[in-house]
């Protein structure tokens, strides 16, 4: 949907995660009037993947960025992962709005390395996200 803005705070928190590793994750939502994407939660640098998942509502959509760390060939890697959480139980209008605004927020958050679209808990499990993050690592 055109006309939905992305707040400057969203870009700032993303850059703090990407450049300064000040946050482990950031979740974003539509504001009350559905005119702007705003920051909802910020997880500190020691937050876990479970902490992050606990911030996602069961019956509504969200965008999120997670600084995913994993081991490959004895070395640690990070992948900045964009997640569109659109659970099956979310209202149709919400799913349509989040899906159609996804490209707008991704254009503002420069440096996303992995994208995950999840409609249920299995698609957002740590194993599923880990598999996606490791997919392009040589």
Swiss-Prot record:
GO molecular function: actin binding
Blocked amino end (Ser) modified-residue sites: 2
Any single Pfam family the record assigns to this protein: Cofilin_ADF
Keywords (A to Z) from UniProt: Actin-binding, Cytoplasm
GO biological process, one term: actin filament depolymerization
GO CC list: actin cytoskeleton; cytoplasm
Domain ADF-H positions: 3-134
Cell location: Cytoplasm
Keyword Isomerase: no
CDD domains: ADF_cofilin_like
Subunit note: Monomer.
Record's function text: Forms a one to one complex with monomeric actin. Can regulate the pool available for polymerization. Severs actin filaments in a dose-dependent manner.
Family: Belongs to the actin-binding proteins ADF family.
Protein name per the record: Actophorin
Source organism of this protein record: Acanthamoeba castellanii (Amoeba)
